[in-house]
């Protein structure tokens, strides 16, 4: 990185660029493909989900943090991860859905396990790859505080704002119409994925955890009960903070 450019300024410009680019693509979809049924819609929607990764690659190259696009993908996808990071990648969905089940805030869809396996590959494009931007790039550049909780609070706000243009598309049903509940769910997952990133070098464990959470929604949906969501998020924050504290100790 250029020694005259701080990590904090990079984080700010990265967030603004990713948010603006996503908003613009979302508006193009609404203007030219409002019914959401054409090939153009699908391609642009994939592009929206890839913007965090694309902007991270561009920033990494421009700032000379990596020498080539090949080096970027190697650093993101081909790192040798610790066994603990893989364990956490599978444990995070257990935390999210397990606590929700204990709080009786889950509706089982009745779909078969086959539906999970069929949907799982799609979540690589529709969710998983955004982790390259948020966790691998932005979390690393949020250097305003050494403390985990303030960094996650800031990251959760950026991640929440990024989702808004996506969930304004008329055919998207994944987002809650209640923006408070929507933000709280984003907040909890920010802490879980953020804790996982503290243990991983690249982005693959975070991508896997994200894909598992999204894919399991085919089988069970976390409901929008405010009290249960607050309890869920509180547990996620406490568990994530404990996981990070163990690593630092």
Predicted regions and their residues:
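Membrane-interface helix/loop boundary segments of multi-pass membrane proteins
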Residues: 21, 129-156, 198-202
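Functionally important transmembrane alpha-helices
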Residues: 177-235
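Alpha-helical transmembrane segments and their helix-entry boundary regions
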Residues: 10-14, 85-86, 137, 151-152, ...
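Active-site His/Glu-centered metal-binding helix of metallohydrolases
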Residues: 128-133, 137, 161, 165, ...
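Juxtamembrane helix-entry segments on the extracytoplasmic side of multipass membrane proteins
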Residues: 108-120, 171-184
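Specific transmembrane helices
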Residues: 2-127, 198, 221-249
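Small-polar-interrupted transmembrane alpha-helices in polytopic inner-membrane proteins
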Residues: 97, 151-164
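Residue-level hotspots within the lipid-embedded alpha helices of multi-pass solute transporters
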Residues: 94, 123-128, 160, 182-187
